[in-house]
Amino acid sequence: MKKDIHPKTFKATIRCHCGFEAQALSTKGELVQVEVCSNCHPFFTGKQRFLDTAGRIDRFRKKYANFEKKA
């Protein structure tokens, strides 16, 4: 077996922007910061955010309406 071919592992603290912290093994370093975790992600919390997709669809149709007329 070859020596020193495996990456070094650290006991890392994973920190979310919501303030949640967890401990895990990582090769990235001792502190890993994430934007979203299971504590604050809408899928896990049940708090869904609806985006204004109706306005986006209207803008898309208005922008590409001329292509439909020409074809």
Swiss-Prot record:
Cofactor note: Binds 1 zinc ion per subunit.
Any Gene Ontology CC annotation: ribosome
Keyword Methyltransferase: no
Keyword terms, alphabetized: Metal-binding, Ribonucleoprotein, Ribosomal protein, RNA-binding, rRNA-binding, Zinc
Pfam families linked: Ribosomal_L31 (PF01197)
Signal peptide as annotated in the record: none
A GO molecular function held by the record: structural constituent of ribosome
Listed cofactors: Zn(2+)
GO biological process, one term: translation
Gene3D superfamilies from the UniProt entry: Ribosomal protein L31
Binding site for Zn(2+): 16, 18, 37, 40
InterPro entries: Ribosomal_bL28/bL31-like_sf (IPR034704), Ribosomal_bL31 (IPR002150), Ribosomal_bL31_A (IPR027491), Ribosomal_bL31_sf (IPR042105)
PROSITE patterns on file: RIBOSOMAL_L31
Domain of life (superkingdom): Bacteria
Subunit structure: Part of the 50S ribosomal subunit.
Biological function: Binds the 23S rRNA.
Recorded family membership: Belongs to the bacterial ribosomal protein bL31 family. Type A subfamily.
Protein name stated in the entry: Large ribosomal subunit protein bL31
Organism expressing this protein natively: Solidesulfovibrio magneticus (strain ATCC 700980 / DSM 13731 / RS-1)
Top-level taxonomy: Bacteria, Pseudomonadati, Thermodesulfobacteriota, Desulfovibrionia, Desulfovibrionales
